[in-house]
């Protein structure tokens, strides 16, 4: 059976990873005395996010936050060939350069009610199904923000985290970090990569 898809015809699909067993301050909760944060999360193929164009990335707030401004804020994506994270942070780049999918100086975060909040990815990020490194990095805030849900992953080394808390360096910010097994509750919106329109005559010629 030969299926011919029109470009742009496929619908977007959402994929959820992680869980809601833990209320976690990282990485958007300046109210806890956090002055700077660097945070990495690894999403592996078995988490089930399909290949395609990533168009939106979201977190699930536990509610009860306050509006916050985050300085020198950026979110980065990078596909890598690993099943767990190592130290220091930059070793997880595998000699590649991550793609900035969101940034702001400041980035203004409203106080979301319990539920999803996040970022549209423009242009979209082409995801080919390998492990996806997600990184959040900011330095300076207005003591606002929100807590988010996560769970402890069955596989270790899924998260690397460092911060400055109440002027004290924790876990060797910004370069070293400490490994955790947190897997944050996140949602990815994926649009399958469109197939270019092909004339029926061209298809017949290819299959003679």
Where in the sequence are the language-model features?
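Boundary/junction segments of secreted and surface-exposed precursor proteins
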Residues: 8-37, 92, 179-208
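A short, local hydrophobic-aromatic micro-motif
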Residues: 55-56, 71, 201
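Proprotein-processing/basic-patch segments
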Residues: 15-24, 131-192
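Aromatic- and Gly/Pro-enriched, solvent-exposed loop/edge beta-strand patches characteristic
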Residues: 49, 68-155
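A short beta-strand-loop element at or near the start of a globular domain
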Residues: 19-64
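Bacterial N-terminal signal peptides
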Residues: 1-6
């Amino acid at each position: 059976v030969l299926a011919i898809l029109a470009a742009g015809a496929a619908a977007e699909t959402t994929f959820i990873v992680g869980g809601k067993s833990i209320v976690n301050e990282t990485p958007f909760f300046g109210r806890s005395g956090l002055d700077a944060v660097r945070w990495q999360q690894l999403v592996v193929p078995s988490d089930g996010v399909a290949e395609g164009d990533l168009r939106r990335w979201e977190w699930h707030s536990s509610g009860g936050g306050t509006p916050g401004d985050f300085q020198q804020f950026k979110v980065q994506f990078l596909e890598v060939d690993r099943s767990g994270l190592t130290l220091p942070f930059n070793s997880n780049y595998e000699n590649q350069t991550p793609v900035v999918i969101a940034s702001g100086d400041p980035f203004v975060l409203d106080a979301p009610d319990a539920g999803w909040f996040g970022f549209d990815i423009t242009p979209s990020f082409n995801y080919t199904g390998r492990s996806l490194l997600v990184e959040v990095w900011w330095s300076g805030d207005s003591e606002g923000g929100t807590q988010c849900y996560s769970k402890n992953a069955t596989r270790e080394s899924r998260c690397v985290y460092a911060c400055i808390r109440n002027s004290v360096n924790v876990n060797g910010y910004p370069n070293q970090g400490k490994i955790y097994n947190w897997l944050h509750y996140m949602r990815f919106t994926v649009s399958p990569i469109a197939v270019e329109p092909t004339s029926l005559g061209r298809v017949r010629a290819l299959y003679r």
